[in-house]
Each structure stands twice: as C-alpha cells, then as structure tokens.
Amino acid sequence: MARYKPNQQNHTDPKQQVVLPTYKLDSNLVLLPGIIYNVTFSRFKAATLLSRFKSQVSNVSLITNLLNEYDFDSKQEEKDDVESKYMPPPISSDAVTGIKQFYQYEQQFKGKNDDSSKVEAEPQSEFDWLVLAINPNLEKIKEPQTSSDDEYENIVTIARVIGMVDDTSNIKLTLQALTRGIKHNKVKPTQTNEVLIDIDWNSNIDDVASKYDVLNSKVLKLFRSIDGFIVDYRQALTVAASLAKKGKQSKDLKQKGDLLTLNPLANSLYLHLAASKDFTKAYISLQKLFGTFNSSSNTKIDNKTFLRLIDLTCAIIPFPNHEKLKLLNKFNSIDRINEVNRMLESMIQVFYNLKKNNKIINHWFYNEATNIQRANVVASQLKSIRLILEGMTNKPDKDIKTNQSPPRQLVRRGNNNKPAKSPMSDDGNESNDEYDDDEDDDDDEDELKAITSFIKGKLPNISTLSSDTKRLIVKDFKRIKSSPPGNSDFHVIRNYLEIVADIPWDRYVTRFKSNKDIDLEFAKKQLDSDHYGLQHVKTRLIQYLVVLKLLGINAEKEFEKIESENSKKSKKNESSSGSMGKNDKQRSEKTFTRSDDSIVIANNDETSIAHETARNKNKKSKSLTTIEKSSLNKSLMVSKNNKSPIIMLVGPPGTGKTSLAKSIAKSLGRNFQRVSLGGIKDESEIRGHRRTYVGAMPGVIIQSLRKSRSMNPVILLDEIDKIIGGNNGVNKFNGDPSAALLEVLDPEQNTSFIDHYLGFPVDLSQVMFICTANEASNLSRPLLDRLEMIEVGAYDYDEKLVIGERYLLPRQIKRNGIPNADLIDVDKSVMQKVILDYTREAGVRNFERSLGRICRFKAVEYSQSLEKLSEYQPKVEIEDLPKYLGLPFANLSTELFESPIESAKCGVVNGLSYNSDGSGSVLVFESIGFNHEGKSGSSSLNMTGRLGDVLMESAKIGLTFIKSIIYKNLLNLSDRNLSENLIDKINNMEIHLHVPSGSIQKDGPSAGITVALSFLSLILEKPVPLDVAMTGEITLRGLVLPIGGIKEKILGAHLNGIKRVIVPRENRKDLIEEYCRSTNDFNQLNDLLLDNENKYNFKRCEPEKFWFDKYGITIHYAREFWDVIKAVWGDALLVKVEQARMVEYHL
C-alpha cells in the first residue's frame, strides 16, 4: 500500500503515502519535527513496542535481552483472551515496505543522494527500522478554550527510535522526531496499530528571506524579554536573601525586595527557563542558530532550514502543549508561519504584562499599603499555598458521595478511614478478599501502587515462596497500609516491600525453550568462537548441558506416564459415581479442585484490562485438575534435583577466566552478573544488613538477582581469593565474609539461602556460580571443599599466537578506530617477536596492550596519510617494533650460554622456577668456594639473592647430602688420595651461593637437586652443561620428590634455549595429563597411566616425544640424586653406587 506521489503544485499536498505502525503516548508530550526526545517507558510497555520490530532488530543485544524477559513467542491460544487482545502483532509486510520507502525518500529529502539510483534499497542499521507514527494523547492535552478534539485526531509525528538506555527498572527510548503526517482513516490497512499516512515533505515557500526577517525580529524580541525576566528574577532572589541575612529593610525601592518571586506565573516560567540544564543548553543553541544567519550576510537561509527553525523555536520556547499541538496540525507551510508568529506575539505579551503588573504591585506594596494590608497579603499567600499542598497530598474518597460528607473533609489514601464495605461483592457472592482496598489504588499518583499490584497479583502465584513467607509479606503490607506516611516504620517497610517486589520471582531466562531442546552443537560453537583452547573447561560445561537435556527428556516421559495413570483413575471414579446427584457432584468437584493452603488475593491493578486478566487467571487456577497439579509438582521436583554447578577457575592473571564466564552465560542464553569480591571485609556485603539499620540493603547475591531480572543467571564471583578473611585465621570484627559464602556456594544449602535483609529463604539452586581465583591456597578449606576446581594454566607462545591473530588484533583494530582490518598487517613472525621479547606473562593481557600500542601508532600514520602528509604502509615489520614498543626485554639465553671471561664454570647450574604471575623461567644458581689454608673445620655457607627460608633449607640439605656421599666414598674417583683431599677441601671451604636477580624474592623446595648439583660441581671442579636445567626437591637420603608447575617450567626452559630438562619421576603423570589435554585425546590416558606404574622402565614414550616435537626438549626423570648425576655426567661416577646396590640386593 506504500507508494510515492509525484510533486504537485499545491503546497498542501503530501509527496508520499506509506503504511506505518502507530503508537499513542501516555503523557501529554507533543513531538515536533527536528527535536530529539528522551521518553521513559515501563519495561513491559517498551518490550511490547519493540516486539513489533523483533525480526528487524534481532542483532541488538539490549533489545533482545529485554524481549527475553517476556513470553511474546507463545501461541495465541495459550494466552488469556484479554491478554492476547491487547498484545500487538509484529509489523506487517505493508509496514515493512512503508518503512523502506520512507527511508529512501528521507535520504533524498536530506540531500544525501541526489541520484535516486544510488539510494539504499532498505535501512542500513537496525535502528533505522524503528520508525513509528506517534499519536498525541488528546485526552491529556487540554486547551483553556474548549474545542473539539476531532480537529487534531488525524495528526501524527513520524519519529524514529535512535537510542535505548536500560536502568534496570525502566527503559528510556530516544526518539528523533522527523516530520509530520496525516492519517488516512478511510483506507484501512490489513493490520491493527497501522495506518496509511500522508507524509509532509513539502518545503516550498515564496520569498523566504522576508518571512525570515519577520520571524527573526519577533524571536529576538522574545529573547530579550526572556533574558530580562531571568535577570530580574535572579536579582529579586539575591535582594531577598541579602535582606533576610541583614535583618533590616532599606528605603530604596530596589533594596526593599521584589514581589516577583511570589507570582505563580513568574515562578513557573523561571523553573522552566533557568532551573533545567537541558532547556538552557537548547536555548543557547537556538540563539546561536539565529545568530549564525544574522551575523553573516553570505549565509542565506533555505526553505528546509526555515521550516526547521519554526519547529525548533516552538519546541524550545515554553509554549503550552495545546499551542504546540496547533502548530503540529498546520500542514500548510504558510499557515505554520502565521501560527508561530501569533504564538511569539502572545508570549512576548505575557512577559510584557508580567513586568508591568509586577511593577504596579511592588509600588503599591512598598509605598502605599499599610502594615495590616501587607500582613493580609502575606497571610492570603500562605493560605493559598496550604490549600494547594493539601489538594496535592490528599484526595477525597470516590465511594463517598459529595452530599454525605462535608466539602472540606480531607481523606488520605490508603488509611483506615475508608467507608465500611459490605461483605457481599457486587455479584452477590461472599468476598474472600480481606485485603481489598478502595479505588484509590487505581490512582496513577499512588506511591504504593506497584507494591499493591505485586501483593495482589503476583505473590499468590510464586511457587518458590512458602505459605509462611507469603503470610509475613502480606502482614508487612497490612502494616504499611494502616500506618501514616510520617511514621518512621512506613518508609522502612515500604523500601523492604519494594525490594521484595523487584526480585524476579519464578522468572527463568534461557536461550532454549525447554531443557529437552538444548542445542549442544550451538553451545560448542559458541564456546569455541569466544575462546581458543581450554578444552577441559568447555567439556565440563557441555557435560552440564547434556545433564539438563537428559533431565528434560526424562521429565517429559514421566509426565506422559503420570497423565495416563491419572486418566485411568478418573475414568473409574466417573463410572463409580454415576448415581451421584448433579448438585452434589458440582459441590464435590469444587472442593476437590480448590487448595486449602493457597492464598488468592484479587488483582487491583491500574487498568480494567488487568482486572479482567486477573479474573481469568483466578478462574484458571480454580479449574486446575489433579493431573495438571501433579505435572507442575513433578516439573518443580525435577528442577530442584537439577543443581547448577559451582565452578572455580584457578589460574594466573590474564588467562581469560572472567571472559570465559561471560562466554558461558552467552552460550546458555542466561543473564550475566559480575560481583567483585576483592577487598570485601564485611559479612553483611554477602548476606545483607538487617532491616533495623539505617540504609540497610540486601547483599550482593540478592542484588545480582534484581539486576539480572531472572532467578537463573550466571553470577561471577570474581577474585574470590582476595576476600579479606579466608585462610588467614584472623577473627574479623565485622565477621568473616568467606564464611558467609559457605551457604551460598553449597548446593545442598543454597536452596534456602536467607539474606538478613529479606528474612526468608530464597532458592539459589538454579543460579550458576562461577568463581575465579589466582591462588587457591588463600581460600579456607571448607570453602575450597565446596567448589569444583578447574585449573586454567598459562598459555604457550603457540596458543598466544593463535589468540592474537583471532581475537586480540581484530579487537584492538576496532577499538582504535581503524576502519578496515586490512589496514594493519601483522604477520606471525612479528607477533611471535612481540610474544617472546616484549611480554613475559602467563596470560595475554600485556600482549594485547602491546598490540594496542602498535595499532595506535598505525592509526597516527593512517591519519597522516589521509592528510597526504606521508605514505601509509599497512605491514608491520620486525624492525618497526623498537619504534612502537621500545626496547625488548633482556634475553636470558645469552646470559646462560655466554660465560664471562676468566670466570669459573664449575658450580653454575640452571634451575627452573614457577613465577608469581603464572609463568615459568630459568634461574641460574652460582656457587663459588674458597679454601682456608691452615684452618681446619672452618667451612661455611653463605647464601644471597633474596632467598626464602624453604630455599635456604633445601640448600643446607643439599650440602649435607653431598658431604655424606663424599665421606662414604660413593663416587667413583680415580685416585684414593683425591677422595681424601676432597674431604679436607669440604671441611675447609667457604661456599657462597648466589641466585641472580637479587631484587626478586625466591622461595620454594623445587631447587633442591639444582643446589646440590651446584655444590657437587664446585667440589669436584666438574662443570655442568649449560643446556641442562632441572627442578625437584631433595631429601637427606637423596630422594627426588615431585613438585608443581611442570608445564610452565618446561615452557620457560624452551624460551631460554634449554635442550634437556631433568624433572622428578613422580611428575611424569602430570606430563601425561598435559599431553592428553593438548592432543584432546583422553582415550589413551588410562593405558599411559598403567604403563607409568612401572617406575623403572616404562615402555610408551608418546608424552616425551610430544614435548620434544613441540619444544625441542629432551626430558630426563630422576627418582634419586644419582639419576641427576647420570643425566648430567653419565655413569662414570656411579660405579660404586651400582656395586653398593648389588650388595644390598644380595643381602
């Protein structure tokens, strides 16, 4: 039905007719073209409006999340009759065509495309589709001179939604008024809430310059009147304040005060003109706009700009709404010009009369009136103010007739002074609603309307609240209805009930319609697209989804079985009760379907639609059969048995733990809430404050439910190891917040979590909690026992390379304003150079910062190329990195393999460390010895390099073990005298052990074999190859014990050029697990572990081959220190050790 009309000579004829969706505002706002308005809607009304464009805005996440809160996709027959009657359907194909053609003509009208062949065929963005024909609410726009509303019933404003803000309670839509239109009521479209509209694109005006001069003179005169009024009003306020401060009066009239501040018209104008920042900003912009055309003789105004100035002037200047409606109704441009000139003259006259009358009353009050007359004037003003205030805060009861009560009787809403109500309802039946109020609850100004609606409409149907809890909430509601607003308990209980009503009871948001419809392939693709690697985390989530899917399938089969059994029982009961009378049968059915413990409170919402909907729901609830009730109970039982997992992601910073939680919520289609626990030291932050305290609020868990608008969100408890309390064993004055988390994170207890503020149990079993931590050792043992720990290890540089190419670089290109991804070319060699030489971390946070710096430099180069200052090169070369990122880190591998001149190579051994940031590195242990000639028994050991107590104890153990094997002559030395000389050498040697990087604290037991080998190398004067690194704890008997961080240490060894690594034999199972995880093949894990049980000779070497192929490192295992000596120097020194083993074996 949308079509173009050719241009015609008659200016009043429109140029376009289209079918557009319509909407009627609830307020008295009049939208004038050219202005952007921020309009606040309730969440439901905004969702109802935007649901009509659901297929066009499906990619806007903010709108999609809002629509997911309401079930707009259910079948029409499943809804209540009244509810479906007022539920607008999606826009029709005629409206879609109309929006497309409106968009095309809008582009041509704005002059974006002079060639009609280049006009875009349809809107380019999602918000371009949100075009509406806004009907003014004529019922709320009243004109002092009574006139018929038929004159304005066909006028509409064509507006587009260009923005949206969600403040968790309301939705604020930004509407851009585009042009005016007239409805064609004779031609009815195929769908309701749509209409054929004549669009006003006319901008033909004869002699626009002279008409602008007339408008400009009037506007400038009005500007002077407004500025003068604001100056006078502010001067009156200043004089009054100074006189009140001095406490005396002046004889000068200007210093005696000004009665302008007592004038209601002056107060209203000043509040509109000066008290609003938005008006001040718009008013200044309007002045500048007129000044632009007045100051420059070269700037000539065109027809479009002139007509836009008319609408802008009328919209910004504080004209009444009925005057704005008149201007909106002027379709003819000449009529519009005459109307705005008349309005300007009227407004100028208002300011002139105000100034003139104020001058007269000031002269009479201060110069002619007596003291009694002045007192009477002030008393009359105060009396008028009191009557107005009483009229604003009180309202007479609608049920009391005017002839039955004094005209001056004031009745407060919601008190106990309401008239007695008959115990019989209108239809003659007994009323069971003991909480039913009068019609004052229907008033839009009733501050308890939302609470009343919740108590009467939603509370009885909440399945997760017990009857005792509902009874306590209703009891508090009765208390607030019977107490005056001035009572202190009134505000406390009102805030409490508002928070209770704001919790999204029984609302579950998910991507899938039911559990049995869960799409596992979609979830896998979503997780893989958001994160690279982390297969063990993804596997755990997929397992959870599989469990949900199977439970949904089993529940559906169980429901069918229950229905078949109950249908057989009902048939038997019907056959056996055939002789029962009709009245008795009806009476028995009524008592059978009615539940004794149910609380049924009639809905008393603000509209008649809500009344009818509530009655239909009550009828439905009364007609529930036992089969339906058993199905609902069974569904609830299955949901209760399905506990959401409580996962803790442990790993170094920057490894994607927080973003992984967001990806989990996205794949499940649930709302996501992040709660930062770092630094929390008060137990009330978790469990809430008790209502008796001033400013009491619920805890972060309940607040997260309110923000997410659902009872099954994904809540991320970020940095749970940074919470104050936990494993330090210190009693806190404000309680232990980590202990408060025990109930929240226990699946057996969080079904009845009690927040101190609410005071009743809340079911958290459907909430998916994900915790993140850097160090699990900082958590208390009871809390750690409740969490399912998943370790997120450090990334190797291959994984960082893929992450940088797929995720980090495209994101930084977009964030830094690069219009096209092809404008920055970073190949693998450059990215690998950045990873190895400019970042040393377990995660990718600094890596992303480095890529961001490169993008910013390239953005500067690109902007200079646009100004033709230089030529732009997209490719980033390795030689450019020092210019972009500065100097690289020092290469430790050169320090390892290049020894200083004349330095002793003996006593230098490479160890492996696990750093605090989650990465691995190589530590060089240096030992130097001095012999004291002539002094026997003067050996000593000095250790430097900020070594911790555990590391120094390991060094002492290693030195004692080396002394013991030399004293026992267990090493195969060539000369006996050499062995005796070694004993004397040890007894008289002063050993100094140093670990470089002295500013870094070092501690831990994993350097035991490294230190022991360093001492042995020093004593035997036998150097250790520099391409060997080792890690492991040593005992006094020479056993090598397992340690942690094997993967990170091997990666650090590889980055520093190490070719051979010695690790404890017991750590081989960790390498096997990492091998299966990296290859994503856990089928052979059991076989590899069985083969690993042979401690001396395992047969399967796939893990070792994997590490060699990936990093070029040969792995050696050590059960005893002798295995370390064998891996470093061979079997030559161990002949006596093998002989001693054979003797011990025969014995």
Swiss-Prot record:
Where's it mainly located? other
Report residues binding ATP.
Answer: 651-658
SMART domains named among the record's database cross-references? AAA
Q: Which InterPro entries match?
A: AAA+_ATPase, ATPase_AAA_core, Lon_lid, Lon_proteolytic, Lon_Prtase, Lon_prtase_N, Lonp2_euk, P-loop_NTPase
Q: What class of enzyme is it?
A: hydrolase
Q: Which family does it belong to?
A: Belongs to the peptidase S16 family.
Record protein name field: Lon protease homolog 2, peroxisomal
Name the source organism.
Answer: Debaryomyces hansenii (strain ATCC 36239 / CBS 767 / BCRC 21394 / JCM 1990 / NBRC 0083 / IGC 2968) (Yeast)
Q: Which lineage?
A: Eukaryota, Fungi, Dikarya, Ascomycota, Saccharomycotina
